[in-house]
Amino acid sequence: MTKNEYLIEKLQVDLANHITELTSAYGEVTIECEVQNLLPVMIELRDREEFSFDELIDLCGVDYLHYGDYDWETESATEHGFSRGVERQEAKAYAVNKPRFAVVYHLLSTKKNHRLRVKLFVEESHLIVPSVHHLWKSANWFEREAYDLYGILFDGHPDLRRLLTDYGFIGHPFRKDFPLSGEVEMRYDAKLQKVIYAPVDIVPRIVVPKVIRNDNRYIGNEGSKND
């Protein structure tokens, strides 16, 4: 029995009432849970001997707003330009029938030498998730980053301030509906002799298509998915 198989077996037995989905792909184990079950799940994963996840190595937000969408209409093909190399496609390559936002945690057990991904989806109308900073100190800045970039609130965080964006920044730049060029630009005004903010004068446009494909490293190697 491999380490992942052992981990999956223990998760199915000990956390069956708290997780909604368990998957294993490309040598990685992922579980999903509801927001209200996050803290009970995380406490079990940290404190139970067979799990012993003593390190939170990453926490991030995800926005699935345009997940699976193509950048161009591809209903017709011509002999010139980008569309000449495009086959007819469906409206979406992939569909996610879940809330728009998710929070993803990556856990590591230095004692058991195994890893786990924990994911929970959050309703856009109620972007509040319990903080886990009291379980892993590394969560402090990770949660601040997710708040700054996605607008996800972490209930119980001791200092939930922006971490990366400028003072007075409006919006959350990693959201898919945030303009790539931003809302305002900062420049030095020679007449006023100070730095000012002004609306951006860049017109957003697509110059490189979004490519949706299966990673060719794993094509024809299905057996490795469940290692």
From Swiss-Prot:
Main enzyme class: translocase
Domain of life: Bacteria
Subcellular location: Cell inner membrane
Gene3D superfamilies documented for this protein: NADH:ubiquinone oxidoreductase, 30kDa subunit
Signal sequence annotation: none
Bilayer topology annotation: Peripheral membrane protein
Cross-referenced InterPro entries: NADH_DH_suC, NADH_quin_OxRdtase_su_C/D-like, NADH_UbQ_OxRdtase_30kDa_su, NADH_UbQ_OxRdtase_CS
Gene Ontology molecular functions: NADH dehydrogenase (ubiquinone) activity; NADH:ubiquinone reductase (non-electrogenic) activity; quinone binding
Catalytic activity: a quinone + NADH + 5 H(+)(in) = a quinol + NAD(+) + 4 H(+)(out)
The entry's keywords: Cell inner membrane, Cell membrane, Membrane, NAD, Quinone, Translocase, Transport, Ubiquinone
EC number(s) from the headed UniProt entry: 7.1.1.-
Known partners and oligomeric status: NDH-1 is composed of 14 different subunits. Subunits NuoB, C, D, E, F, and G constitute the peripheral sector of the complex.
Family named by the database record: Belongs to the complex I 30 kDa subunit family.
Protein name in the entry: NADH-quinone oxidoreductase subunit C
Organism field: Legionella pneumophila (strain Lens)
